[in-house]
Amino acid sequence: MARYTGPTWKISRRLGISLSGTGKELQKRPYPPGQHGPGQRRKLSEYGLQLQEKQKLRHMYGVNERQFRKTFDEAGKMPGKHGENFMILLESRLDNLVYRLGLARTRRQARQLVTHGHILVDGSRVNIPSYRVKPGQTIAVREKSRNLQVIKEAIEVNNFVPDYLTFDPEKLEGTYTRLPERSELPAEINEALIVEFYSR
């Protein structure tokens, strides 16, 4: 399945979450597109709830179905809770951490920065958005890319960096200091439903 590249506001309204991180998609019409009001939302079956939760997480991180399932299966081989490990692996993606550091305003924008070669990991250029960053590794903007307007704008509006990251706004450089705890990952996701979905 290819990655969705259409308007994110439709997906945001359908799933009831903000994919842009701004929440603007849900401010005016916090109900799915095509419906005539908030009271028209259909009650979902158990399978429907599981599928919706899977789609929420998949679209949140901007991952196609094949990558998503591959990461899920990999998480199942790790010690600990399957669902929590799955979310930690997704959170450790390079494009996501570029977004978390505030170098991009959305994950989609962060993915483009990585793909276009603007990002370094431990001093080497990495252009693979799914690259898994390990604790202790450093993420930085290339010297030639430091004046990009999209990065400047993102830095101006970013006022929060998670505790598992450190960031130096002068150097445009951050470090993934440790793996995140569950309490630091998206609270609106019930990963148990995703585990149930793939266990059917």
From Swiss-Prot:
Keywords: Ribonucleoprotein, Ribosomal protein, RNA-binding, rRNA-binding. Residues 21-42 are annotated as: Disordered. One of its GO terms (biological process) is translation. This is Small ribosomal subunit protein uS4. GO terms for molecular function: rRNA binding; structural constituent of ribosome. PROSITE patterns: RIBOSOMAL_S4, S4. One of its GO terms (cellular component) is small ribosomal subunit. Pfam families: Ribosomal_S4, S4. Belongs to the universal ribosomal protein uS4 family. Residues 92-155 form the S4 RNA-binding domain. CDD domains: S4 (cd00165). Disulfide bonds: none annotated. The gene is rpsD. Part of the 30S ribosomal subunit. Contacts protein S5. The interaction surface between S4 and S5 is involved in control of translational fidelity. It comes from Geobacillus thermodenitrificans (strain NG80-2). Transmembrane segments: none annotated. One of the primary rRNA binding proteins, it binds directly to 16S rRNA where it nucleates assembly of the body of the 30S subunit. Signal peptide: none annotated. SMART domains: Ribosomal_S4, S4. It comes from the Bacteria.
